[in-house]
Amino acid sequence: MKLHELQPAAGSRKAPKRVGRGTGSGLGRNAGKGEKGQNARSGGGVRPGFEGGQMPLYRRLPKRGFTNIFAKKYVSINVDRLNIFENGTEITPEVLLERRVVSKVLDGVKILGNGNLEKSLIVKGCKFSKSAIEKIEAAGGKVEVI
């Protein structure tokens, strides 16, 4: 086989739908828009959520809740992600960011207790779940809670 003999896989290349180019094409005359009406006109159609004039669903349902602008957003990781560090390493949110364990530190890092920890580490400047504290201390590490 040579480069000039290469063919695309059967069915992978589809011809574009050329509408309004004569009746012989099968998409002439009304160009797939049917007969008259709002949708046949240029710029026709209704806006999203419009239900023909009846009260739309988004207005029938009550508003609920609010966004607390003071809420703290924490990036959460599990203790098994800390196994990449050497024994005795001091871990802070900055170190986690530097080693790409987390992609960003929002209002802080919270360490959760899923998985197993084999390394003895000193973890500072984070929030912890109870199970994470137990697992870090069981592995011989230290926890400094903020």
UniProtKB/Swiss-Prot annotation:
A molecular-function term among this protein's GO annotations: rRNA binding
What keyword terms does UniProt attach to this protein? Ribonucleoprotein, Ribosomal protein, RNA-binding, rRNA-binding
Compositionally skewed regions (Gly residues) per UniProt: 21-31, 42-52
Stored Gene3D superfamilies: 3.100.10.10
Keyword flag Ribosomal protein: yes
By its UniProt entry, which PROSITE patterns does this protein fall under?
A: RIBOSOMAL_L15 (PS00475)
Task: Return the annotated region ranges for Disordered.
Answer: 1-54
Any GO CC annotation of this UniProt entry: cytosolic large ribosomal subunit
Question: For this chain's UniProt record, which GO biological process terms are given?
Answer: translation
Q: What is annotated about its quaternary structure and interactions?
A: Part of the 50S ribosomal subunit.
Q: What does this protein do?
A: Binds to the 23S rRNA.
The record's similarity note reads: Belongs to the universal ribosomal protein uL15 family.
The record, for PANTHER family, names: 50S RIBOSOMAL PROTEIN L15, LARGE RIBOSOMAL SUBUNIT PROTEIN UL15M
Name under which the protein is recorded: Large ribosomal subunit protein uL15
Species name for this entry? Clostridium botulinum (strain Alaska E43 / Type E3)
In the record, what lineage is assigned to the organism producing the protein?
Bacteria, Bacillati, Bacillota, Clostridia, Eubacteriales
